[in-house]
Amino acid sequence: MNDIQLDQASVKKRPSGAYDATTRLAASWYVAMRSNELKDKPTELTLFGRPCVAWRGATGRAVVMDRHCSHLGANLADGRIKDGCIQCPFHHWRYDEQGQCVHIPGHNQAVRQLEPVPRGARQPTLVTAERYGYVWVWYGSPLPLHPLPEISAADVDNGDFMHLHFAFETTTAVLRIVENFYDAQHATPVHALPISAFELKLFDDWRQWPEVESLALAGAWFGAGIDFTVDRYFGPLGMLSRALGLNMSQMNLHFDGYPGGCVMTVALDGDVKYKLLQCVTPVSEGKNVMHMLISIKKVGGILRRATDFVLFGLQTRQAAGYDVKIWNGMKPDGGGAYSKYDKLVLKYRAFYRGWVDRVASER
């Protein structure tokens, strides 16, 4: 992230705002697509309700820009990559990684290139980054106001962890997705977690978790936790896990939230088992994609690792599907009768609204 310039002038404390739900987007980093889906051809996508095209430049850098050519509006996703630029399929105008038109071909051998290039021949681009197997785009201001979260366990080349990426489409608002981790009350009704008690925690001092320093200094860190007292392992693999000696009495969830998502660290009886990155692709109104990357600590031999992958990876993916089913029937900005157990959800909403207020414009 050192190559991404932050807009330091805009990073300052703002009023927290009301604890209401919002369908608006916070200024933050969002996922455009999986890295392995962007190869040597332009890819059509929609972000923030905006038609976009993604492609890789000469250096392999991911570029995301407006999809329709500034000339006559042709679809650049139907074009191709030529000399490190994206070439329009209609008149072969070429745009570089910054969105500037750098070449307009002539009409015959005598006139090989038209000059000068029209001043308005430019494609608006989004700030991009690439990490954790995702292409990210910044939303809300010309320059990023906070960095990507630092998660060494989630780096795809970290051989100490097993990684599982998955995604679900949903019709709910982004806030509903990113606040879900902080809702302790749904653990039993939705996920059948056999809990006898839970404790909600809020953290103001980031220094116990050095990886969040850059987020915290930008005012973009939301620290929280839930400690569940659990009777036994849950789900269809409970019997197998107990047979392997994987019993537990405490499930400790630590959350390093940021405006566009969350990093959850899961420990059982104090032993960290995996980290989960939750992030979102805002597609258009009424359509978003929740992404999750689970990084599971490698322990023991093949059987133990396979069990952990199923228990912490595949079962978590299945559990996420239960949440999505609920979300798809929710009113995105509904509700309002809160209990004391909604404390973390409401605190996160206030944090999130502060970053909604930092959005410079919708474009």
Swiss-Prot record:
Keyword annotations from UniProtKB, A to Z: 2Fe-2S, Antibiotic biosynthesis, Flavoprotein, FMN, Iron, Iron-sulfur, Metal-binding, NADP, Oxidoreductase
Effect of D323A: Significant decrease of oxygenase
Coiled coil ranges: none
Enzyme class (EC, first level): oxidoreductase
Residues that hold [2Fe-2S] cluster according to the record: C69, H71, C88, H91
Disruption phenotype: Cells lacking this gene lose the ability to produce pyrrolnitrin and accumulate APRN.
Cofactor binding summary note: Binds 1 [2Fe-2S] cluster per subunit.
Domain of life: Bacteria
Annotated positions for site Important for catalysis: D183, D323
Subunit: Homodimer.
UniProt protein name: Aminopyrrolnitrin oxygenase PrnD
Source organism (scientific name): Pseudomonas fluorescens
Species lineage: Bacteria, Pseudomonadati, Pseudomonadota, Gammaproteobacteria, Pseudomonadales
